[in-house]
Amino acid sequence: MAERTIETELSAECLPKHVAVIMDGNGRWAKAKGKARVFGHKAGVEAVRKSVTTANRLGVKVLTLFAFSSENWRRPEDEVSLLMELFMTVLTREVKRLHKNNIQLRIIGDKSGFSERLQRKIATSEALTANNTGLVLNIAANYGGQWDILQATKKLAVQIAEQGLTASDITEDMLSAGMSTADLPDVDLMIRTSGECRISNFMLWQAAYAELYFTEQHWPDFDEESFANAIAWYINRERRFGCTGEQIQALIQE
């Protein structure tokens, strides 16, 4: 029997299948540099690229990024407008790169809250990458965990009415089937940047058994090494291999 090294163990069994990230700290990062908040949001786009690239190279199956919560509409109107334009620009610029790298893009959340122009761009971007078989990249936009559970419950209510089901017929799997990530594995590792230790209504159903990783780094500073350290922390929590961030980075380079 071939010797099983830590590298084969990591690549075969131990990596999280689904990583979710609350990308926090763009505004604080910008403020520390004496810049407007939008400067931080734009800098955060590069951190997104690095995380997507790292997850894809490692063989993570699903990466879900919390880009815009249902509560973010309460921010100043000019900031929300800039965020929507940035979303449109990034979709236009990045989708071809994602497609080239066999990444499937999905936007999860209440898309009806966006402009028709942005909804069309989302639809065309998702259609372009729909048949890709690599990393599934979920961008959670106008998303909230409570919203997700509510919309799944409404779907289930229709099913109950149509099929004449009773309360005893209802199962967790039936509710799970209506969630925005129904065909994907639940979250194994949830990362939050910028020092806040809460999950802020993000993937409440899917992250029921996730490991929660909090880092003081603001999102624009979260790079390949940061991602590798989070993965190493998860592996040590799950498997107790004594894995290091450097070993994870070595896997990325293979």
Swiss-Prot record:
EC class of the enzyme, as a word: transferase
Superkingdom field: Bacteria
SUPFAM superfamilies (alphabetical): Undecaprenyl diphosphate synthase
Binding site for Mg(2+): 24, 211
EC number: 2.5.1.31
Any single GO BP term: regulation of cell shape
Active site: 24, 72
Subunit structure: Homodimer.
HAMAP family: ISPT
PANTHER family tied to this protein: DEHYDRODOLICHYL DIPHOSPHATE SYNTHASE 2, DEHYDRODOLICHYL DIPHOSPHATE SYNTHASE FAMILY MEMBER
NCBIfam families the UniProt entry points to: PRK14830.1 (NF011405), uppS (TIGR00055)
Record-given protein name: Ditrans,polycis-undecaprenyl-diphosphate synthase ((2E,6E)-farnesyl-diphosphate specific)
Organism: Photobacterium profundum (strain SS9)
Designated gene of the protein: uppS
